[in-house]
Amino acid sequence: YIPPEKLRQAASLRWLACASSGVEQYLGEYLYAAPGVILTNSAGAYGITISEHIITTLLMLLRRIPEYYDVVHQHQWKDLGRIRSIYGSVITVVGTGDIGTAFAQRAKALGAAHIRGVHRTNKVLPRCFDESYAVEDLDFALAGADIVVLCVPGTKETEHLITRERLGLLKKTSVLINVGRGSVLDQDALMEVLNSGKIAGAALDVTNPEPLPPEHPLWNTKNLIITPHVSGNMSLDITCDIDVNMFCDNL
């Protein structure tokens, strides 16, 4: 992250190449000392690593791994009962770019029964999606979903896209994953539905704010997995290779 005051001091800056998909913090001519600065992102570099992170946290929730973690650390040998599977599930993916599509492909390979894609454009979705919804029809796409995955960037249009009312459309057995931006989700409402058992679980790789303060109640929310915005970092070799190749192509 480059602070705005640093950007305003860079009088010779002509191109800002970001090694991230989201660049909302760098939008706006007022940020730069000189007009006409070219801004590029790395959308397309993170599908592999973030989709694998989604699958990891999703399986942890479906198989109740966080609950078993607590059980074994209390030195108990206890079967918690029913678990669930990606196989046969109905999945709603909000955001059908590189990340959402990479996840949908992997979920389909694991036997997901029906995958809905929610998008902001009228593009034709890849075959891994069984159904296509415009963002205006999000309520219909959420209804009846076993799994909801959020992969959208943080913009004015996506702020609190998942409201208290929309969380209320989910089933008691539903799980939600957010790898987009923390601003997309009403976190207070999420804490309420998790603590009251109105949905089964959630995993957040992004929060609002970031870093999440140590005293924030989100840390103590039931059936919630939190990771510190690491699903799409540069620690996977293939991600670095793709990112460097994209930079060279842009150059």
Where are these regions (language model features)?
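Glycine-rich NAD(P)-binding loop of Rossmann-like domains
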Residues: 68-102
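Short loop/helix-cap segments at secondary-structure boundaries that form the rim of catalytic
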Residues: 5-10, 26-34, 121-130, 213-220
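Phosphate/diphosphate ligand-binding glycine-rich loop within oxidoreductases
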Residues: 1-69
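Rossmann-like adenosine-cofactor binding region
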Residues: 122-217
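Phosphate-coordination loops involved in phosphoryl transfer and adenosine-cofactor binding
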Residues: 36, 87-90, 112, 164, ...
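C-terminal helix-to-coil terminal segments
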Residues: 37-53, 67, 210-251
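Conserved S-adenosyl-L-methionine
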Residues: 109-113, 200
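Short, well-ordered coil/turn residues at beta-beta hairpins
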Residues: 1, 19, 151-154, 178-179, ...
